Amino acid sequence: MLRFKYCILAAIAALMITSCEKNVQIITEINRDGTCTRFYSIKESDNVYADETWVEDTADTVRTTIYRTFNSVGEMAANPVLAVNGEFINSQAQLDKKFKWFYTDYKFSETFASKEHFINVPFADKMSRDELSFMLTGYPNLTEGMTGAEIADFIGPLQEKYEYLATLSMIDCDLRLIANHYDMIANPPVDRTTFMSLSDSITRYALDESWDILRHRNGLIQDYFKSDAYSIFYDSNDDIKDEFEDEYEGYLNFVDLYYLITPYNLKMPGRIIETGRGTLKDGVINYCFGGKYLLLGDYTITASSRVTNVWAFILSGLIVLLALASLLYRRG
C-alpha cells in the first residue's frame, strides 16, 4: 500500500495535469420536475461508502454501478457517499427553475467543499495560490496569450518549485513521525529540534541526488545523516515499525485525495445553454473533476439548459387563431 502511494506521489511531481482516469465516475441526471438521479460507477476504489438506500445495477459486470433517485438536488447533496479515509466529500447543490411561458430555464450548481486541510506542507513561500492551482487543475490559465517558447520558459521554474513541494510532501511524513518518536532513538546524530529544522536541506539533498524515494524510502534519511540511528523505524520487525507504519497511513490523506479521480457527467433537461468548465458531447456535459480540485478551496460545477414548452406555442397559436376568427366574425 505504501509503495503504491509513493508511486502515485512521484508521478504527481512529474505531471502538470493528470488525465481523467475513471476510478469513480459520477453521473447526475436532472429531470424536468426537479427530481434527480445520482449514479456512481466504481472500479477498484475504496472511496465510496453507500448504504442500503442505494440500488446496485447488476447489469454492469465490469464496474460496480449504484444509483439513487432524490426529490431534489439539495436532498442529493445531503447524502454523500464519496470519502477519503472515512472523511466524506460534502457538497451543496441548487437547481433554479424559471418558467418563461414559451421556455423553462434550468440552472444547476453543485459546490464541493474544500479539503485544503489535507495539504501537509506549507506552499505559500514557494508558490502563489494561483500557481499551485494551475499545476493541480489547469486553472487559472496562467499561460493564456503566451507563445510556445514563452510557455516553456514559464513552466520550467514553476515545475521545479512544484517538484520541490511534491518531494517535501513525501519526506515530511517521515520527518514528523520520527520526531514524534524521537525518544526511541539511541544516540541520534542531532537533537529533535535540529532534526526538524533540516526538512528543506533533506529535500534539496533528495532532489540533487535524484534519490529514488519509491524504492529506497528507508535509505534517504540514513544516507543524509550517515547514520543508522533511524533504522528502527524501517528495518525492524517489532512493534516500533508497525506503529510507525500505521501512523504513516494517516499522513497520506493528501495523496489519497489527489489520486481520487472522479470525472463528473451531467445530464440536464432540454437544450444545453452553458456548461461552465465542462465540455458538451452527445447531450452530456463532461467535467474533469477529482480530489486535487479541492486542495485549494471549494469547487463548483455549473450548467444551464432550456426546455421548449411546445404546448405554450400551440396554445398561443390557438389563441391567435381564435382572436383572428373573432375579429373576422365581427367584421362579417
PLM segments and residue spans:
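C-terminal membrane-anchoring or membrane-association module
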Residues: 324-332
